[in-house]
Curated annotation (Swiss-Prot):
Residues 163-279 form the HD domain. This is 3'-5' exoribonuclease YhaM. It is an enzyme of class 3 (hydrolase). Belongs to the YhaM family. Shows a 3'-5' exoribonuclease activity. It holds the Pfam family HD. SMART domains: HDc. The lineage of its organism: Bacteria, Bacillati, Bacillota, Bacilli, Bacillales. Keywords: Exonuclease, Hydrolase, Nuclease. InterPro entries: 3'-5'_exoribonuclease_YhaM (IPR020873), HD/PDEase_dom (IPR003607), HD_domain (IPR006674), NA-bd_OB-fold (IPR012340), NA-bd_OB_tRNA (IPR004365), YhaM_exoribonuc/phosphodiest (IPR050798).
Length: 314
């Protein structure tokens, strides 16, 4: 079986089909144009540079294009890159299905739906339960397919749902340890906090930001969605405002994207749960590509640190 891109080590030669996830134009110090492309397969992605590109080449190598690439793997300033020696667009008779090249959540969609539904079923506050069920049903198809982000954490097909399922299990464990927490509020906050990303982001493959995403962002989008759902369900109660606050504050600080800091206990805990799950996902994926006794490539979203994998960890 042919190796996947994440399985190659520094110095190894590569000759493989990959999908262009993103392609970004830049200008080199010599004034010539180049492309920074992120190439992916189900195991993950890797950055590559295409130097001295013509306008015709730019039009060829765009997002969602399958390419055949030959080159080698190198470590450039702590980042793993693919140095391209040859590249061409794949022929239709070679590969055609883009879905064969995308990373997916390690849990089946139907299993995630079942688990999330069970958490909603356990809610005892009827207003919170109705609002949560209504909004999840409204956006369920996209919720199950979309990534949680364009980069950094859970940036794969079904990553949003996988992030939520992991956070729900964390929320349950923390609620059992601290019974003063309102489980209904916390579970609803987990399910709804990033649901606006199904409007903020373009889709599960070659994900970019929509116009609404660029101008409003998923936090504002979801606060509005909760308000609309409350009107449709004729719920006029404080739970609506508290849920809106939990979503609004889940990034923790204004400089991190939240207009208000958490001012409700469950909002504070949601912020920590969200942060913990995102960071664990980033570390696990980086360490999963690393041999025992070696350091990961630098993880930009974690202060550009490289993490060491102990020799006794297989």
């Amino acid at each position: 079986m042919k190796k996947k891109i994440a399985e190659y080590e520094v110095g190894e030669q590569v000759d493989i089909f990959l999908l262009i996830k993103t392609a970004t134009k830049g200008i080199a110090s010599n004034g010539k144009p180049f492309l920074t492309v992120i190439l992916q397969d189900p195991s993950g992605d890797i950055e590559a540079k295409l130097w001295d590109v013509s306008p015709e080449v730019e039009k060829q190598y765009v997002a969602e294009t399958i390419v055949k690439v030959a080159g080698d793997i190198l470590n450039y300033k702590g980042r793993i890159q693919l140095r391209v020696k040859q590249i061409r667009v794949a022929n239709e008779n070679e590969v055609t299905d883009i879905s064969d090249f995308v990373e997916k959540a390690p849990v089946k969609k139907e299993d995630m739906v079942e688990k999330i539904t069970q958490y909603i079923f356990e809610m005892r506050n009827p207003n919170i339960q109705r609002l949560t069920r209504h909004l999840l049903n409204k956006h369920q198809n996209e919720f199950l397919d979309y990534p949680a982000a364009t980069k950094n954490h859970h940036e794969f097909v079904s990553g949003l749902a996988y992030h939520v399922v992991s956070m729900l299990d964390l929320a349950k464990a923390i609620s059992n340890l601290y019974p003063s927490l309102d489980k209904d509020l916390l579970y609803a906050g987990v399910i709804l906090h990033d649901l606006g990303k199904v409007i903020e982001l373009s889709g599960p493959i070659s994900t970019t930001y929509t116009l609404e995403g660029n101008l409003l962002g998923h936090i504002s989008i979801m606060v509005n969605e909760i308000g609309k759902a409350a009107d449709e369900l004729q719920i006029d109660a404080e739970e609506v405002l508290i849920l809106q606050h939990i979503v609004l504050s889940h990034h923790g600080k204004a400089e991190w994207g939240s207009p208000k800091p958490p001012l409700v206990k469950e909002a504070e805990i949601l912020h920590y749960i969200d942060n913990l799950d995102a960071k664990m996902n980033m570390m696990d994926r980086a360490l999963g590509r690393t041999k025992p006794g070696e350091y990961t490539e630098r993880v930009f979203a974690l202060d550009n640190r490289s993490f060491y994998k102990p020799t006794f960890h297989n």
